[in-house]
Amino acid sequence: MKCQRVLTYLRIFGTTMFGISLLVGISTAYIMGYQFFTTAHNHLSFGLYGAILVVHLIIQSLFALLEHRNMRRSLETPIKLNKSLALCIAAYQEDPNYLKKCLVSVKRLTYPGIKVIMVIDGNSEDDMYMMEIFKEVMGWDNSATFVWQSNYHIKSPEETDESYAESLQHVSRLVLSNRFVCIMQKWGGKREVMYTAFKALGRTMDYVQVCDSDTMLDPASSVEMVKVLEEDPMVGGVGGDVQVSKLHFYFSVRYWMAFNIERACQSYFGCVQCISGPLGMYRNSLLHEFLEDWYNQTFMGSHCSFGDDRHLTNRVLSLGYATKYTARSKCLTETPITYLRWLNQQTRWSKSYFREWLYNSMWFHKHHLWMTYEAVITGFFPFFLIATAIQLFFQGRLWNILLFLLIVQAVALIKSSFASCLRGNIVMVFMSFYSVLYMSSLLPAKMFAIATINKSGWGTSGRKTVVVNFIGLVPITIWFTILFIGIIYTIIQQTKKTFPQSEEIVLIVGAVVYASYWVILLTLYTVLIKKCGKRKKEAHYDMVLDV
């Protein structure tokens, strides 16, 4: 026991020093600006910091490839489908069409005897349509339903202590004695909804799968995730490949990259940072080891009501269990179709990322060093990028601004080209479009998320009643103002001094290259997507989900 404690302390010390050394090393390389080579008049250069980022991308891609190879090998692994499994669906003001498609896909799951519990966040007349859809799809005779005036943590004023206690028992009996259950309860947020499903199930299930009400599941999705948990008892949770059901190009290619490169790499080392809400599965025995702590999570004195899935994943990691990703398990989900809703979603996700980064750092020593390495690289990269942008925009040289834009698109094109080769689809090249969204919107949204990290809420409204929130435009406006001032400052500085002919030539060539890049990319987009690649929405489901 004493020896084990010493080893734990040594691991804590080792991972801490590794993380600090890595951050100090990267910061030093950035601040010193050491250059391996530079051209005359400093038009082009390649430094140590750039080399670090290139090596990171190469290593990340390599391990992602190795993990995909492991996934293909798992096809040969036979499993017994004899473990009990419950699917928990969280619903909140969902679009009726999305909800119906979700439930139809649930009925088509191939895992035998799966129990389905849908908990609706809200119990008013306006929410009743979701329960009606549940009964219609799952079967009027097969569905057990209950409209609860309270929830597990808030007692309705209309209930007495005795009736509240009876309601708690009734919810548990309903869930345990029926296969298809729908519960409407007092509004409390997504975490409250998930808690109800987990608590009512108790320890009666072997595995618990989570799903959002806008998600359409592949029939084999549950089987493939069970396979991962069955292969290794030290895997505590697993997530699948979340794809975008609407043909919204920028999001679909970005989702593919995030899951099949970034999370696949994390999965190779058993430390996936977030098992997504639309498609995830956990060992039920682990859930009940931290259920109360997960629900009662606080940050800066406030109860946390967002980042539920990421914190659930981190709780599994905190116990020393691995978290995995499998591309064999798939689903389709909806993404915000308007810019403001997307921005609010990204801000909410960024809040949970930075908050959970701090929590996650306490468990680095329980996992592979890659977990520490990637946390440092991805956690601090936005700050280095913002510093670089501001520095180049305020150096008083137009070429620096143009070079920054060229490098951003060059890196995006390299990453998207690799994704095209891996996926075998030229469509992935258009992921380079996403770099514009990242630089113009996601970066300032991340900073805004840090500034408002203790603000709670769902972050986005339900789909049936869309509420537009313009607060996300504040950091975007500030960011564009800073960059605009930098451009004006640079133009003024350039007019004060003689413009070298070599600089003029480089500027013209760079501008032509940048403009040509966008002309070619937009032309390809028009040809491949708008004409040749245009498909009906239903065709996207033909592969596995023609619902």
For the regions a protein language model found, what residue spans apply to each?
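Membrane-embedded multi-pass helical conduit in multi-pass membrane proteins
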Residues: 27-48, 375-457, 472-547
